Amino acid sequence: MLTSDTRDTDACVKEALELAEAGCEIIRLTAQTKAYAANLENIARELRAAGCHVPLVADIHFKPDAAMEAAKWVEKIRINPGNFVDKKKFEVREYSDAEYREELDRLREEFTPLVLFCREHGRAMRIGSNHGSLSDRILNRFGDTPEGMVESAIEFAQIARDLDYHSLVFSMKASNVKVMVAAYRLLVERMNALGPDWNYPIHLGVTEAGGGEDGRIKSAVGIGSLLTDGIGDTLRVSLTEDAVREVPVAYRLSNPFQPSERSDDPVSFPEPELSYDPLKFSKRQGGLAMCYGVRLGWEQPVRVAVPDAGFYALQTEREAMGDMMPELSLGQLDAIEVDPRCDADLEPLKELAEPSLVTVKNGLAMEPVYAFRLLAARIEDRHLILLKDTLVPGSVSGEDVPLTAARNIGSLLCDGIGDAVLIQGESDPRLASFLGFNILQATGTRLTRADYVSCPSCGRTLYNIQEATARIRKATEHLKGVKIAVMGCIVNGPGEMADADFGYVGGAPNKINLYVKHTPVKFNIPQEEAVERLVDLIKEYGRWVDPK
């Protein structure tokens, strides 16, 4: 998605050409008003004249008239069903069935002109639910849930289908990766139940993932988990960085799932019965074990381990590592290694008197996610599971290491599987430990520092969000468990903050509004003062501790 102001034709064309050169295959621009949408004509014309024919998408919030204007000039319209017609007021009320139908009739009346225009002019449409911006109507009936996200999109899609329009794409984005994964899975189940003619493409993304390694890991957990499940046709990695930096990360995530050039018939394996509900998160409740004074399992945090040599090398850095210090070595864990397909490996586990830590053997020709899902399905619940990022240490390298680890371990954590994690793909024990804790942080499994919801910036952003995010992180990263949202604008920012404790939101050019939960409490603060005022606000609400 472009970060340039949509009214600035030259800047948008330059950025779009850079994205196309980097390999971006679809380019999205914000169109927050009809005037912004009208300039898409100039942008599209200049791009086509420059030989760039990458499809353009207009991103629409709140403004049906902007959508109608944008549809004249671009190949695709993205609407948010949470705010295309409904205005979010955070009101709590009960809707009778009759009142709910009246609201749907109003929605149909507002939405129909856009559907008919797109149908007649060959435009595509993405119906993109966002967890943080569900309408009051949906929230009051379905709650702030994956079910609400899916129903919100299905309502719009049904109207489109009634008008014989089918050029639809769905997305179910959230900053909480467990919610995101559950919502996409629920969407697929719902589409399957509605019938084979509901087989529409699906666009993947973790909204407000942030920047740096945190943003990449969070995106890899959410997007990678779904790609592993066979879900997804397009994807966008939302980083609080220059847009062109998102593209190589997207390719690294998608490359393992691209169709093979080999002509061999695919090999199918019987699916084991799952030991968990893939549509609702629930932690697998194993027994309780003790390893060298460290409790594992029942109601304990997921532990981080590293290979023996690395663990002992880190002992001199214990103070510097702080909360990111691995708690155990692989040898101390004394995990039982098994092939989850082999009855001879699994039968002895039934004879053990006490809960034991079990893991999958290295070297097996199995994808880690499938191997550990099978293990969880085949061993007794009382036994604990040590997750591994790879079963073939050394098989990945460079920037693929954290993305692969996040995809494999993160997917399993989102399924509630895992009592300890071992990073084998990273040879540096310090980096391996950091990676393990960062994956736990990204999945919300275990928080060792502040958590951030940071939007990737777009043409609506009213200040330098990359600089502000870096300053906020530097000032607050030590606040374990505090969640801070850094949002570019007030158009969609307050809703997209989701469950953040505090919000830092652009209110006017270079002016910041500060929020507590969804409530704005400080207004029009000059950007150069805003981080300090945010710290004061955190102190005022009793969430501040001095850094060590």
Where are these regions (language model features)?
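Hydrophobic faces of well-ordered beta-strands that scaffold small-molecule active sites
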Residues: M1-T3, E25-L29, V54-I60, I77-I79, ...
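Glycine-rich, proline-tolerant flexible connector loops at the mouths of alpha/beta enzymes
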Residues: T3-D8, A22-L47, P81-E102, L168-V177, ...
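Short, acidic/polar
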Residues: R7-E18, F62-M68, A153, S219-I223, ...
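N-terminal active-site wall of soluble small-molecule enzyme domains
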Residues: A31-W73, F311-L314, A320-G322
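Hydrophobic or amphipathic alpha-helical targeting/insertion segments
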Residues: H53-E91, D97-F117, G122
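Conserved, mostly hydrophobic/aromatic
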Residues: D59, I127, F170, L226, ...
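Catalytic alpha/beta core domains of metabolic enzymes, predominantly
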Residues: Y95-F111, L116, I138-Q285, D343-V486
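Beta-strand/loop-dominated core regions that host nucleotide or nucleotide-derived cofactor-binding catalytic loops
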Residues: P509-I512, P520-R543
